[in-house]
């Protein structure tokens, strides 16, 4: 919301009350409580007829400082509330001096000044990183609609850039944007977002989580160009400042606080193919797709049935359409015999035509209006109603239906929708409708996730989810929603993926080839390269199929090449996935996250790091023209083997079987021996590639097992012209390729052979000494 009108005025109809002076400070257990008045109250006359703000400073985890600014403490505060991991024994320090009161957790402290002018500062090791000054936080009375708000404005420094706030498709850097965290079904081409997360981070190495599930209004360097303003309709405002000091460290602490991304099963990293949305399909159509992929040697790992596996007008009652799929169990059994995993589409709504609608209504499993009638409308399905997942019995009914599908052979669910949740309703458990609007996405996906956890096991659980709220990163995978079939939408999708990664989500996908309309073949091929160098890869459309031969023969070559490449990259990719699970670092990440000290990376949103070591720059033109930036160092193309200097921009042109994929120097990269499946023994026949190891540096490569744990570690250390290689753990028949090195002066512990990419060394054991 806009509060100010320029620099000196406020918006018509608003009354503002600010904390201006500290009146008193107390220590209450591990909290520091500050009482602040909106005027000078040193004289008793001014201590009457005045509001008094209560500010509570506390720490739910080390290096996280919570701030709660309260006006009326007696206001209703119904749930839901974010499921945060709050620790009770965090060590804090509270200091009360003549000049200030300071609350400290780890390296982060909040300092409130005493005296004539109000000041709230956040400091890292005593150095200010942000804060708010006089008249930049407080209470807003809106006489236009008789609503009351709390707001805060935190300072932005010169050159400070803001990221996150969920999966947003606008410019990656949020500066200058107005953001309302209200889940909407708006596609990828608008300011709306399926996944609104009231958390942002900046390139100064800290993050801020606003702890309100309802709509939070952000003015990011917009209303006040050197401030991030956030406001909420409430009698209190609670937020957490999370220290880094690096972007990775911020996400580590944030996801420790809100939940780590679960580790998806290895098979989910393979290629997914769908029926598409409104296309005509039955078992014969499905088999033609799957057999067509096999005939063309196109690896395929997951097949997805979209909405029309159920009867029209009845979604979602979880009954297969008997006319289209008369033998679903047999069909699934036959498909799984071909080595496929099966996914089916669901959502949290039900059409009035369904035979079970009356039962659900009578049992109270559907969302009601305050007068007791069902909430219904005719969008999406006629007479559509919404499952009330605050009712435990409704959850059990829904879960039992899903368990029946799992028993039939379904492996996972596409949890679509969950954004257009109304507020003129009465929830079974009395939840606040404003808060439940966004939080519904969490309880919906949590319910489905728990079904899979209880049936196939957590190590096999995976969703394909569209909506999300804070904490929903625990239930991967998420995809970017409905995009158009053009380069602009492809770029929008990438921005959304980078944005959600900066918001705590580790795994992300998008509709390869675009969802709406049908892409020209050149767009499809470029998108396939990008999609198969994403954490998860799915071919999906709306009114047309996405099998590659529907475009041209070369599309088959592109899908084959990049699917096989991804399968070979799985030792590297799954180790990065395990790190996302352990630390919250997304697999696909903005350049600024990996290179926070390089200011040239701050605004880059057409390229990304795939894990720690590989830079990918998708091509967004038919001709193949692409520009990209490489940070400091010497970079090598993953398969072309050309080397480029960093700290500069590069311009190239690529065919459809290529794009810029560069590996940074001092990298030891593991490639597997299987180009047909993502799930195999990655420690057997592993081909390690050593890229530009510099004198005095060490490269370490950890090869994961199926559970993400490290089964084998290879280290290469260079001193002068000598490289010492040592392996520990379990590995069979591994090799080491010295990229762009064709000859060595000495080799101990193995044999050597030439290759196009460099000298390949086969060890006799697990130790090598190489003299360059």
Model-derived segments and their meaning:
Residues 70-72, 81, 299-559, 594-598, ...:
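Aromatic- and carboxylate-enriched substrate-binding clefts and catalytic-loop regions
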């Amino acid at each position: 919301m806009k509060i100010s009108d320029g620099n000196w005025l406020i918006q018509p109809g608003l009354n503002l009350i600010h904390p201006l002076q500290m009146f008193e400070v107390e220590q209450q257990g591990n909290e520091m409580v500050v009482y602040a008045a909106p005027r000078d109250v040193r004289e008793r006359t001014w201590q009457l007829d005045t509001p008094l703000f209560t500010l509570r400073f506390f720490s739910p985890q080390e290096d996280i400082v919570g701030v709660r600014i309260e006006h009326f403490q007696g206001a209703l505060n119904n749930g839901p509330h974010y499921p945060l991991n709050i620790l009770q024994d965090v060590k804090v320090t509270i200091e009360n001096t003549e000049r200030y009161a300071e609350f400290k957790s780890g390296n982060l402290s909040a300092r409130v000044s005493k005296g004539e002018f109000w000041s709230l500062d956040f400091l890292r090791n005593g150095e200010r990183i942000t804060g708010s000054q006089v008249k930049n936080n407080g209470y807003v009375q809106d006489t236009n609609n008789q609503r009351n708000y709390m707001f805060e404005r935190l300072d932005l420094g010169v050159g400070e850039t803001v990221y996150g706030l969920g999966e947003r498709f606008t410019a990656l850097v949020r500066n200058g944007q107005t953001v309302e965290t209200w889940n909407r079904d708006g596609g990828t081409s608008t300011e709306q977002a399926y996944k609104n997360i009231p958390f942002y981070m900046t390139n100064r190495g800290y993050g801020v989580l606003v702890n309100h599930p309802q709509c939070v209004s952000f003015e990011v360097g917009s209303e006040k160009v050197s401030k991030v303003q956030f406001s909420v309709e409430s009698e209190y405002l609670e937020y957490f400042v999370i220290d880094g000091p690096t972007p990775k460290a911020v996400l580590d602490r944030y996801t420790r606080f809100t939940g780590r991304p679960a580790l998806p099963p290895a098979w989910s990293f393979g290629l997914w193919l769908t029926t598409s949305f409104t296309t005509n399909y039955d078992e014969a159509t499905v088999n033609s797709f799957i057999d067509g992929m096999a005939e063309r040697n196109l690896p395929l790992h997951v097949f997805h049935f979209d909405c029309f596996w159920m009867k029209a007008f009845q979604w979602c009652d979880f009954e297969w359409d008997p006319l289209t799929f008369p033998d679903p169990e047999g069909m699934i059994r036959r498909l799984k015999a071909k080595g496929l995993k099966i996914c089916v589409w669901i959502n949290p709504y039900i059409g009035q035509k369904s035979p079970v609608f009356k039962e659900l209504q009578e049992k109270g499993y559907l969302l009601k209006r305050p007068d007791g009638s069902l909430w219904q409308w005719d969008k999406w399905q006629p007479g559509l109603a919404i499952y009330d997942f605050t009712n435990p019995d409704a959850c059990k009914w829904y879960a039992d239906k899903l368990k029946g599908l799992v028993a039939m052979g379904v492996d996972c669910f596409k949890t679509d929708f969950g954004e257009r949740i109304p507020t003129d309703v009465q929830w079974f458990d009395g939840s606040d409708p404003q808060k439940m609007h966004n939080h519904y996405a969490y309880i919906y996906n949590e319910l489905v996730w728990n079904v899979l956890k209880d049936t196939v096991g957590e190590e096999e659980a995976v969703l394909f989810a569209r909506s999300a709220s804070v904490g929903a990163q625990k239930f991967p995978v998420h995809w970017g929603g409905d995009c158009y079939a053009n380069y602009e939408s492809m770029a929008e999708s990438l921005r959304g993926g980078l944005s959600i990664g900066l918001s705590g989500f580790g795994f992300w996908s998008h509709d390869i080839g675009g969802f709406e309309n049908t892409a020209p073949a050149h767009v499809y091929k470029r998108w396939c390269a990008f999609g198969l160098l994403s954490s998860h890869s799915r071919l999906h459309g709306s009114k047309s199929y996405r099998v590659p031969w529907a475009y041209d023969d070369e599309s088959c070559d592109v899908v084959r090449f990049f699917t096989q490449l991804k399968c070979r990259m799985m030792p590297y990719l799954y180790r990065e996935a395990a790190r996302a699970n352990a630390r919250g670092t997304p697999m696909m990440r903005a350049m600024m996250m990996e290179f926070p000290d390089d200011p040239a990376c701050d605004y880059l949103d057409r390229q990304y790091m795939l894990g720690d070591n590989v830079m990918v720059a998708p091509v967004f033109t038919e001709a193949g023209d692409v520009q990209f930036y490489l940070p400091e160092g010497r970079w090598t193309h993953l398969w072309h083997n050309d080397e480029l200097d960093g700290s500069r921009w590069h311009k190239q042109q690529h065919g459809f079987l290529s794009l810029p994929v560069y590996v940074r120097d001092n990298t030891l990269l593991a490639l597997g021996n299987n180009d047909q499946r993502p799930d195999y023994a990655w420690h057997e026949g592993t081909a390690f590639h050593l890229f530009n190891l510099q004198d005095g540096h060490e490269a370490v490569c950890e090869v994961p097992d199926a559970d993400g744990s490290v089964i084998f570690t290879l280290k290469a250390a260079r001193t002068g012209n000598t490289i010492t290689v040592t392996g520990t753990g379990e590995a069979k028949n591994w090799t080491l390729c010295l990229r762009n090195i064709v000859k060595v002066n000495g080799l101990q512990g193995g044999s050597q052979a030439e290759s196009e990419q460099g000298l390949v060394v086969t060890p006799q054991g697990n130790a090598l000494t190489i003299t360059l």
